[in-house]
A protein has these predicted regions:
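The serine-hydrolase catalytic nucleophile loop
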Residues: 57-69
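Short alpha-helix in the alpha/beta-hydrolase fold that links the catalytic acid
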Residues: 66, 221-230
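Conserved alpha/beta-hydrolase
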Residues: 73-91
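Conserved acidic catalytic loop of the alpha/beta-hydrolase fold
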Residues: 103-120
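Flexible "cap/lid" loop of the alpha/beta hydrolase fold
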Residues: 131-134, 138, 147-173
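Short beta-strand/loop motif that positions the catalytic acidic residue
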Residues: 205, 211-213
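Acidic catalytic loop of the alpha/beta-hydrolase fold
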Residues: 216-220, 247-248
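Catalytic histidine-centered segment of alpha/beta-hydrolase-like enzymes
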Residues: 245-254
Length: 279
């Protein structure tokens, strides 16, 4: 089972090896109070506009290394990638995991205090991190410049389960699985109900919003894009369907993501890194 999701889990050893000879390395810090610990990695001057990256399930803040390592993005953004509660060293009240989308979103709000620029924050969430990003944006819309959801799992009627899903709930099997995998399983089995709670939220999102979905995504049903079109009421929204893309769009279409982030007029300029066939 773990091999199915190994690409989403990055060990500390792999991180050390990756940055062993790097000239610029992310700064890893812990935001902590009496009940909350948030592990974050940041790179770029903190006086630059913040780009906040929220991972899926399972996942890690290091799942965005390719974006954090991009020199052009480093020059223009204070890039902050966070371990959601239940992943890495991020915890809330010593709980192993938190399945509530609202609680997850509220737990991330202290990160906004790290924004020392005069501009609002760009929030990017992918997969299971997308609805958490959206909920967070709905809580502090005045602090957010734009919302980008990549391969979002947001339709409560399109939750996918696999042959191995039920085994992930077995307490004996869980003893041999990475903690992040068990956290993801807990999230998955409550996700549809949590997404139903999100239904009234979508109409309250009015910041510029971009939704990107792949046609060959085996985790997020492509119809999640139709759900977004129907429920998001922002007049400044765009929807991008990549016919041949899978789930890992932030890797396979990194140049497109990068160009989107660097565009100062996101909703007026054409995204040239995307070819006319939507590949």
């Amino acid at each position: 089972m773990t091999s199915c999701f190994s690409r989403y889990l990055i060990s500390e050893k792999q991180v050390r090896q990756h940055y062993a000879n790097a000239e610029v390395k992310p700064k890893v810090t812990i935001i902590k109070d009496d009940t909350l610990s948030l592990s974050i990695a940041s790179i770029g001057a903190d006086t630059l506009p913040m780009l906040l990256l929220i991972h899926g399930a399972p996942g890690s803040l290091w799942g965005y290394m390719n974006l954090m390592d991009d020199k052009d993005l480093q020059k223009h953004f204070h890039i902050v990638s966070v371990d959601r509660v239940g992943y890495g060293k991020s915890r809330l009240k010593k709980r192993k995991f938190v399945t509530s989308i609202e609680t997850q979103a509220k737990a991330l709000l202290p990160i906004f205090a790290l924004n020392h620029s005069e501009q609002r924050v760009t929030v990017l969430g992918r997969s299971y991190g997308a609805p958490i990003a959206a909920k967070m944006v709905s809580l502090v819309p005045d602090k957010v410049k734009e919302l980008i959801m990549v391969s979002p799992v947001i339709d409560p009627d399109k939750e996918k389960f696999y042959w191995f899903s039920k085994w992930g709930r077995n307490s004996f099997v869980q003893l041999f699985l990475p903690g992040e995998f068990n956290t993801a399983t807990a999230e998955k089995y409550s996700h549809s109900d949590e997404l139903k709670k999100m239904l009234p939220v979508w109409q309250n999102i009015h910041v510029p919003t971009t939704v990107i979905q792949g046609g060959n995504d085996w985790i997020a049903d492509p119809e999640n894009l139709d759900f977004a079109r129907k429920h998001i009421k922002s007049k400044r929204a765009q929807y991008i369907f990549l016919h041949n893309a899978g789930h890992m769009i932030t890797y396979t279409h990194a140049s497109m993501i990068k160009e989107m982030l660097l565009k100062s007029l996101l909703f007026q300029d054409k995204i040239t890194a995307l070819d006319v066939k939507g590949q």
